[in-house]
A protein has these predicted regions:
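Periplasmic solute-binding protein
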Residues: 1-15, 171
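Structural detector for helix-capping/boundary residues
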Residues: 25, 105, 122, 152-153, ...
Length: 414
């Protein structure tokens, strides 16, 4: 539900990578047409997607994160500005205390259209390709195989894992990969499923004597109270996201652009014997950091012609020297925030007391051991100029196949 103003440099990078027309000015115009920002101070934008400023509803403990940011001379992000650099209260895609998704904005209002047919619980198995043109799809619903044909275009929006999987299952992709999986080659497009990128974050927990979300919803009475408050008034801890303060910062004064993302949340989690995570009863907070611009590239490739067999995913994380350095800097940033007077004054103890003393080698090993995905996979059908190093052009059309586009995060160049 988090909604950030992107950095204009991100889209400059996209244009340099061959995504013509995806520069900041063009994308900003699209953002303005998509979003409707709601706050007590000001409203702007006329788009269908609601973006709410919930800063006044955030947990009181979060003010300590803001104080730490001021201590480190970080700016306070302005969500109307070009740059979201700094640490601030997160704006969210909510309305009246409820999640407001892209489906709420676009799909639900269109359900009554005569030219829209929604088929639920269906699995698309492959595309129907004839003479280098996508004519339809083969799908299964209720154990019955069916076909659907397109007069104009087919748009894949199955995500950074599903879209390259479907292309490869349809015979579009690297010849050797398809051959091993037993899929007949229709169109050799070597970068389908290649170039996978994702964000990895490391998180550290700290105990505190002050009240946090653990105090509010970490016990039975608190959960019932919060639930009733939400049902009756659409307010309280269940009406705002757990991720309350976040932003983008520079790992050093030499950094040209913000290259780390910080999350600071008034909550900690515990794990039971079955490995299930839950909100602990004792008050605590977490500090999390992730490098924003990893350079390593992985892959997603099918291992069978059966759509029900998951593809092989190789993240190839921390493969480059730069990524290893940034992993260390992410850990160092958590050390820096934790050492501010603002955070030390409310910290009872660190759950990992040795972390503050780790040298660079120990920090890298700690990142390798504990970092986890932030679920931002992308780039597996990336935009570009040439079929030799990309899958689609800047209009999201698949190289060499007519009437076929890919419209999801797999299209990101980086």
């Amino acid at each position: 539900m988090q909604c950030y103003s992107e950095d204009e440099n991100d889209f400059s990078d996209w244009e340099k990578a061959g995504a013509e027309g995806w520069g900041w000015k063009n994308v900003l115009a699209s953002y303005n047409a998509l979003e409707n920002h709601i706050s007590k101070k000001e409203n702007y934008g006329n788009g269908p997607i609601c973006v709410s400023d919930l800063s006044e509803q955030m947990h009181p403990f979060s003010k300590h994160f803001m104080a730490a940011a001021r201590e480190l001379n970080w700016p306070k992000p302005n969500n109307t500005a070009i740059s979201s650099e700094g640490l601030g209260y997160v704006h969210n895609t909510t309305r009246n205390g409820k999640r407001f998704s892209s489906a709420d904005a676009f799909l639900h209002p269109a359900k009554k259209r005569k030219n829209l047919h929604i088929i639920k619980n269906a699995i698309v198995e492959k595309l129907i390709i004839n003479n280098s043109q996508s004519d339809g799809i083969i799908y299964e619903v209720n154990n019955v195989k069916k076909c659907a044909y397109a007069n104009k275009e087919i748009i894949l929006s199955a995500g950074a894992i599903g879209s390259p999987q479907l292309l490869q299952l349809s015979g579009i992709g690297p010849e050797e990969i398809l051959k091993k999986a037993g899929v007949k080659l229709v169109h050799h497009l070597p970068e389908v499923g290649q170039g996978l990128q994702d964000h990895l974050a490391i998180t550290k927990y700290f105990m505190t004597n002050e009240r946090t979300l653990n105090s509010d919803i970490g016990n039975f009475v608190g959960k019932v109270t919060a639930g009733l408050r939400y049902l009756l008034t659409k307010s309280g801890p269940l009406s705002v996201p757990v991720n309350q303060t976040s932003g983008f910062v520079r790992s050093s004064v030499k950094s040209i652009v913000p290259d780390l993302q910080i999350y600071a949340n008034p909550i900690i989690y515990s794990t039971n014997n079955n490995g299930k995570t839950y909100v602990g009863k004792k008050s605590g907070f977490l500090l999390s950091a992730q490098p924003s611009r990893f350079s390593s590239r992985g892959s997603i490739n099918i291992q069978s012609s059966d759509v029900n067999i998951p593809p092989l995913i190789n993240p190839n994380s921390l493969h480059t020297k730069y990524d290893k350095l940034m992993a260390i800097k992410a850990c160092q940033m958590i050390q820096t925030i934790a050492a501010t007077k603002a955070m030390e004054s409310v910290t009872k103890k660190a759950c990992d007391p040795n972390f503050s003393k780790f040298d660079n080698d120990a920090l890298l090993n700690n990142f390798r051991e504990l970092a986890s995905t932030v679920y931002h996979p992308c780039c597996t059908c990336r935009m570009g100029l040439s079929p030799s190093d990309s899958v689609i052009n800047s209009r999201l059309q698949v190289h060499g196949i007519k009437k076929l586009r890919v419209v999801d995060a797999s299209s990101f160049p980086n």
